[in-house]
Amino acid sequence: MLKQSEAIVLRTYPMREADLLVTLFTRAEGKIKGVAKAAKKSRRRFGGALEPLTHVRVYYEDRERQELTRLDSCDVLASPMSAEVDYPRALALGHVAEVIDDLLPDREPNDAVFRLSLAVLGQLVPGAVWMPLTYFDLWMVRLAGFLPDLMHCVVCGEELDDRAFFHPLVDGLVCANDKRLASTELTVESRAIADLMFRAPLENFAGAPWPRQRCADLRRFLVQILERHLEKKLVTVTMLDKLD
């Protein structure tokens, strides 16, 4: 029996001569893996619907005693290919896919992450990737339950004033008195923006100038949290760090 769901294509891998192994983040069932038979040959059933980060309606069938779903067809609802995909945007799109794929377990629906992902994909336009990336990482850390207290020192418990610091070996922010050597400062501006992002939709921040340097410290702090919990380095972060 065919099921259907909205979904975001995360990754595709060649499988045999004409098939594709596809990882999808579905709204109904969370992350699933399936086989698109003859996807390299059949333009009618799949066309460009299996490009990473495409928003689709997928039709699929779970088969008894088989781990992989059979993908029947996909209808494109929105495609990242509808706008220019320059190198920074390609990396940003890849980062969204990598974090979702690495962080979320299989077969656990998460509507909050699904809605966040669609909102971020809609704002990841050429020349304006840093604001939606900041918003995405911030909310993914929060929705995963990893976000520490941003108002108090994790060591002494005192309220943080105008200076706060983070360190790879400390799970949270610390005050100036308790910071370790080689700590990085999280500025007052970045903490204030994080607070605003928790209280306002992504669209409220669109259109304002957002150079790479803005909230770079916040993104570094969030990536540090993600990588600690994933126990691995995020490949796309290394590549984003190399952008001019």
Curated annotation (Swiss-Prot):
Disulfide bond positions: none
InterPro entries: ARFGAP/RecO, DNA_rep/recomb_RecO_N, NA-bd_OB-fold, RecO, RecO_C
Keywords: DNA damage, DNA recombination, DNA repair
An example Gene Ontology CC term for this record: bacterial nucleoid
Pfam families: RecO_C, RecO_N
GO BP annotations, alphabetical order: DNA recombination; double-strand break repair
Its job: Involved in DNA repair and RecF pathway recombination.
HAMAP family named among the record's database cross-references: RecO (MF_00201)
Protein family according to the UniProt entry: Belongs to the RecO family.
Name of the protein in question: DNA repair protein RecO
